From Swiss-Prot:
Disulfide bonds, paired cysteine numbers: none
Family (UniProt): Belongs to the bacterial solute-binding protein 7 family.
SUPFAM superfamilies: Periplasmic binding protein-like II
Role this protein plays: Part of the tripartite ATP-independent periplasmic (TRAP) transport system SiaPT involved in the uptake of sialic acid (N-acetyl-beta-neuraminate). This protein specifically binds sialic acid with high affinity. N-Acetylneuraminate (sialic acid) can then be incorporated into the lipooligosaccharides (LOS) as a terminal non-reducing sugar, protecting the bacterium from complement-mediated killing by normal human serum.
GO cellular component: outer membrane-bounded periplasmic space
Name listed for the protein in its UniProt record: Sialic acid-binding periplasmic protein SiaP
PANTHER family hit by this protein: PTHR33376, SIALIC ACID-BINDING PERIPLASMIC PROTEIN SIAP (PTHR33376:SF4)
Residues reported to bind N-acetyl-beta-neuraminate: N33, D72, E90, R150, R170, N210
Stretch forming the signal peptide: 1-23
Length: 329
C-alpha cells in the first residue's frame, strides 16, 4: 500500500524533525506463503534490498512471510484491492480464475524450466493469461522464477511405474497432484502438509511427492529411504505487483522495480537449481537410495487425464495444451 509521506515530510520539517528519520516516499508490502528459511524469502530479501538501493531509499519494501497476510488466494485479492503491493503465485494457481491455467501443472506437460518460460511468455495462451491478470485481476507480472520440480519419496524402491501400483501416496488436495497418483497406479491419499511426517513415520502412507527442498526442510528423508526422480510437475513462481501500486510509481521507479524483480527471479532460479543438485548428494549421504525410473510409461499413463482436462476446459484448455506440447523438446 502506498504511504504518502511528502506532506508528512513538509509538516515534520516545519516542526524541526530531521528528514533523516522519516519514512520512504513509498512504503510497500510483500506478502508470501513461504517462511523465512525458504529460497523464496531469500530472493524476496534481495528484491527488497535492490529496490531500496536503486531507488535511493525512495521505496521501502517490508516482507510478510509464512502466510501472515492470508493464503495466496487472499493475497491476490489484496493486490487487486490495492491493500497489498507484492506477492508470489505459481502460473497454475490462476486456475482459480481461469480453469485452463491448470495446464501449467498437468503432470509431464512442462518438461523443463525453459518450456515453462516459453509457455508463459511466447505462446498466445500465455500472453493472453498475462493480459487477463492485468485487466481482470489488477496485477502486473514482473518476472518468473523456477521453484523446483516434484519428486516421489517412498518406503520401497520405485524402479519402474509397476512399483507405483497400490502405493499409498500422500498428495495435496489439488486435482493435478491427485491425478498423478491415480493415473500412475498409486492410491492417492490427500492430507494436510503438517500431518505428512507422522503419517510417513507410522506407515499410514507409503510415500509423498514434493520438490527436493521441501523433502529436506520437512526432514522426510528421516522416515523415507527411497527417492524416485519422477520429475512429474515443475513449479514456477511469479513476482506480482498490484496495478494500483505500480501505476502510482513514476516511470523511473517502475523500471527500478521491474529490473529488481528480474534480477531476483534469476537469483531465485539459481537457488533452486543449485540446491537440487546439492540435495541429491545430501540425501545419498543420509542413506536414501535414489532411483531413476523410465519416465516414458509415466507420461503415457497421463493421456487419459489430458483428455479429461480438455473435456472439462473445452476449446481453451485444448488450445493451451496443444500450444505447450508444441514447444516441448
Amino acid at each position: 500500500m502506498m504511504k504518502l509521506t511528502k506532506l508528512f515530510l513538509a509538516t515534520a520539517i516545519s516542526l524541526g524533525v530531521s528528514s533523516a528519520v522519516l519514512a520512504a516516499d513509498y512504503d510497500l508490502k510483500f506478502g508470501m506463503n513461504a517462511g523465512t528459511s525458504s529460497n523464496e524469502y531469500k530472493a524476496a530479501e534481495m528484491f527488497a534490498k535492490e529496490v531500496k538501493e536503486k531507488s535511493q531509499g525512495k521505496i521501502e519494501i517490508s516482507l510478510y512471510p509464512s502466510s501472515q497476510l492470508g493464503d495466496d488466494r487472499a493475497m491476490l485479492k489484496q493486490l487487486k484491492d490495492g491493500s497489498l503491493d507484492f506477492t508470489f503465485a505459481e502460473s497454475a494457481r490462476f486456475q482459480l480464475f481461469y480453469p485452463e491455467a491448470a495446464v501449467f501443472a498437468l503432470p509431464y506437460v512442462i518438461s523443463n524450466y525453459n518450456v515453462a518460460q516459453k509457455a508463459l511468455f511466447d505462446t498466445e495462451f500465455g500472453k493472453d493469461l498475462i493480459k487477463k491478470m492485468d485487466k481482470d485481476l489488477g496485477v502486473t507480472l514482473l518476472s518468473q522464477a523456477y521453484n523446483g520440480t516434484r519428486q516421489t519419496t517412498s518406503n520401497r524402491a520405485i524402479n519402474s511405474i509397476a512399483d507405483m501400483k497400490g502405493l499409498k501416496l500422500r498428495v495435496p488436495n489439488a486435482a493435478t497432484n491427485l491425478a498423478y497418483a491415480k493415473y500412475v497406479g498409486a492410491s492417492p491419499t490427500p492430507m494436510a502438509f503438517s500431518e505428512v511426517y507422522l503419517a510417513l513415520q507410522t506407515n499410514a502412507v507409503d510415500g509423498q511427492e514434493n520438490p527436493l527442498a521441501a523433502v529436506q526442510a520437512q526432514k522426510f528423508y528421516e522416515v523415507q529411504k527411497f527417492l524416485a526422480m519422477t520429475n512429474h510437475i515443475l513449479n514456477d513462481q511469479l513476482y506480482l505487483v498490484s496495478n494500483e501500486t505500480y501505476k502510482e510509481l513514476p516511470e523511473d521507479l517502475q523500471k527500478v522495480v521491474k529490473d529488481a524483480a528480474e534480477n531476483a527471479a534469476k537469483y531465485h532460479t539459481k537457488l533452486f537449481v543449485d540446491g537440487e543438485k546439492d540435495l541429491v548428494t545430501f540425501f545419498e549421504k543420509q542413506g536414501v537410495k535414489i532411483t531413476h525410473p523410465d519416465l516414458v510409461p509415466f507420461k503415457e499413463s497421463m493421456k487419459p487425464y489430458y483428455a479429461e482436462f480438455v473435456k472439462q476446459t473445452g476449446q481453451k484448455g485444448e488450445s493451451a495444451l496443444k500450444q505447450i506440447e508444441a514447444i516441448n523438446p
